[in-house]
Regions:
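Low-complexity, polar-biased intrinsically disordered regions enriched in Pro/Ser/Thr/Gly
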Residues: 143-149, 271-281, 527-545
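Conserved long hydrophobic alpha-helices within structured protein cores
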Residues: 131-137, 415-422, 516
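General secondary-structure edge motif
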Residues: 115, 142, 146, 158-159, ...
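A short glycine-/small-residue-rich loop at the edge of a beta-strand within enzyme catalytic domains
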Residues: 121-125, 415, 451, 507
Length: 645
């Protein structure tokens, strides 16, 4: 038996591989020349045996008896026959070659452009057979969530730029359909202007979808009930802090580079109206102070004090006196003590650079810091940023739906949102690289509605170019393309260039209309000109010609039907389609749009989560002190201890 197996292996090793398509194409192209050689070769052989007084007579005999030349299938090997056959084949090849090289290139019907609308056949290779595993773009077009399709030429990144004026349905026709899909291994981060999306879709996400095993079979418990896989819902509410979970940026600092990133985000998103590039000295000085103080808090303060409240206390305690350069405040003394223990400490090195400023200059820097961090004077903001419940670093490890609620009229607290997004991108990329070998187990979809209102995310143009490989994608939702240029300036082109998909829902902003019209291209149309000349003898004329026309001009885009949209996918013809109708989705009945009973109540959910965290069976140590005992705490060893059950 072992001998038979070895023979089979050897036979497999000698299997002939199928020829390459390019090789087959070249062979087929040369077959006509082989036929010419063969026919001329055989006729030349027969011509030598034809009798006649002239060449014409011999050719006539050849034509009358040409079947005799092919009685033997093999070509003649006589030198004369081989030479004439070769010359004939080469001559035909030369004629074809030079005719093709010098010939005119006609593209009938495409003289002025070949633009056209895409159809079902064009989008078919990009659609996943499992409906839930698609990004819903229009009523008829979808894009698979699979980042590695069988044919690499159909691979597209999942970054989408959605453009639509006010009232065009960006939330209804794009954001909600994505949430209704609820794919198995996808988490969502949603910017929610006014906080309506979480109310309308939260209950559906909290319920989740049926849990499946590795074979795709729905799991059931011992009672036969379907086991559900709900989304873990997180909420940051910058409109009503009472309805927000806690977010502490200090919780996600892992190293000195994270301190620098956090400081940079604060500086970029809290610029005053009068802050200009000419005042660069002051911003750099502020940056040094922030790095020093945050570095001290991160490395030296207990975990419960690592927050913005402590940072404000440091700044408030940083008193300076113009008339007394030798004066040392409480913060100076803390850093001097730290320097004695660790002279090369990151915070110490930053603080020493800051202290190079004279008393008057330092006072101006502190005033700038106080003005920049003025929003933290609000007790509610300090409270929600006192500790962390967001688990930003775990969004790519578990089914999560993070809602970031922002005001569409007031940007006072948008710097907090920009801070969160900046940390989120960095945390997810680092976790993908360090823990999951480059790819997160859960694809993180960021649905950034009203993207222009969340502030500036540092180096976003570089992030969007690299997040694809880590299973992260961003949907940038704008009212016009000019909004992106206003915030990101020259980097706006890079950002749009890294979005393989563009969805236009309607609008009237001229720059946007112009760019979309140019991108759609031109088609070739037929043009008829008629003339009617009246005089002594009346004459009519009809002139036919071709001309070019935009597939959709700016004025046509401006008056586009409200139910229509335009989809552009890289490498595919554009689509003019109906917007997605959420009422036809199988999960529409789980939204509050269908039934008000489906409204999601954030406070109740947060209360329930708190009750889950506080297990009633868990025991805690309770220490009780009298005032006299507090005074003698260092010497008193008799502490009262109780148990809470």
């Amino acid at each position: 038996m072992s001998g038979i197996k070895n023979i089979k292996k050897k036979l497999k090793g000698f299997q002939v591989r199928p020829p390459n398509a390019e090789v087959i194409k070249k062979v087929l192209l040369h077959i006509p020349y082989v036929v010419v050689f063969y026919v001329v070769n055989k006729c030349t052989w027969l011509y030598q045996y034809c009798r006649g007084s002239t060449v014409v007579d011999r050719l006539m005999v050849l034509l009358m008896n040409y079947p005799l030349a092919f009685k033997k299938l093999l070509p003649s090997i006589q030198p004369k026959s081989l030479a004439v056959g070769t010359i004939a084949a080469v001559s035909v090849w030369a004629v074809v070659y030079f005719k093709g090289k010098n010939g005119k290139k006609f593209r009938q019907g495409e003289e002025y452009g070949s633009a056209r609308w895409g159809n079902e056949k064009d989008i078919a290779p990009f659609i996943d057979p499992v409906f839930e595993n698609n990004i819903l773009l229009t009523q008829t077009e979808r894009l698979t969530m699979n980042s590695r399709p069988k044919k690499p030429k159909y691979a597209r990144n999942k970054n989408v730029i959605v453009i639509g004026g006010s009232g065009s349905g960006k939330t209804r026709f794009y954001v909600k359909p994505q949430l209704m899909q609820m794919p198995d291994n996808v988490s969502f981060v949603v910017t929610d202007p006014k906080g309506t999306i979480i109310v309308e879709c939260g209950k559906m996400l909290a319920r989740g979808t049926p849990k499946k095993d590795k074979n795709g079979k729905i799991l059931r418990d011992k009672n036969g009930r379907v086991v559900m896989a709900p989304y873990k819902i997180k909420v940051l509410n910058t409109i009503n802090f009472a309805k927000s979970m806690h977010y502490n940026p200090f919780h996600y600092i892992r190293s000195e580079k994270d301190i620098l990133k956090l400081v940079n985000t604060i500086m970029v998103n809290t610029k005053g109206e009068g802050e200009k590039s000419s005042e660069d000295f002051w911003t750099k000085a502020e940056r040094l102070l922030y790095c020093a103080l945050i570095g001290y808090i991160y490395y030296e303060a207990p975990e419960e004090e690592q927050n913005f409240s402590t940072l404000l206390e440091f700044i408030n305690a940083s008193e300076t006196r113009e008339e007394d350069e030798e004066f040392k405040n409480a913060v100076d003394l803390l850093f001097e003590e730290l320097e004695r223990d660790e002279p090369n400490h990151f915070a110490v090195r930053q603080y020493k650079k800051y202290k190079l400023a004279a008393g008057k200059t330092a006072k101006s820097i502190l005033i700038s810091c106080g003005a920049r961090l003025a929003p933290f004077d609000i007790a509610e903001l300090r409270e929600i940023m006192s500790y962390d419940e967001m688990e930003l670093d775990m969004v790519g490890d578990q089914r999560t739906a993070l809602f970031i609620i922002i005001s569409d009229t007031d940007d006072t607290f948008n710097f907090v949102v920009a801070m969160m997004y900046s940390q989120l991108f960095n945390l997810l990329c680092d976790r993908a690289d360090d823990v999951h070998h480059g790819r997160l187990p859960y694809h993180v979809r960021i649905l950034a509605d009203e993207f222009a209102n969340i502030g500036q995310i540092p180096k976003f143009d570089k992030l969007i170019a690299t997040i694809r490989s880590r299973e992260i994608s961003a949907s940038i939702i704008l009212q016009s393309q000019s909004q992106l240029k206003t915030i990101y300036k020259d980097a706006a082109e890079t950002i749009t260039g890294n979005c393989d998909t563009m969805l236009f829902l309607g609008g009237k902003e001229s720059t946007t209309l112009k760019e979309i019209s140019e991108t759609l291209g031109k088609e070739t149309i037929d043009l008829y000109n008629t003339s009617d000349t009246r005089g002594q003898s009346r004459s009519y004329g009809l002139n036919y010609q071709k001309t070019g026309k935009e597939l959709m001009s700016r004025d046509e885009l401006a008056v586009m039907d409200g139910n229509k949209c335009i989809l552009q996918l890289r490498g595919v013809r554009p689509f003019y389609s109906d917007k997605f109708d959420i009422t036809k989705h199988k999960r529409y009945k789980q939204l509050s749009d269908y039934d008000k009973k489906n409204e999601f109540h954030v406070e109740e959910y947060m209360k329930h989560q708190m009750e889950v965290r506080l297990d009633p069976e868990e025991q805690f140590d309770l220490y009780m002190y009298e005032s006299s005992e507090l005074e003698e705490q260092s010497n008193n060893e008799n502490e009262g201890t109780g148990h809470v059950t």
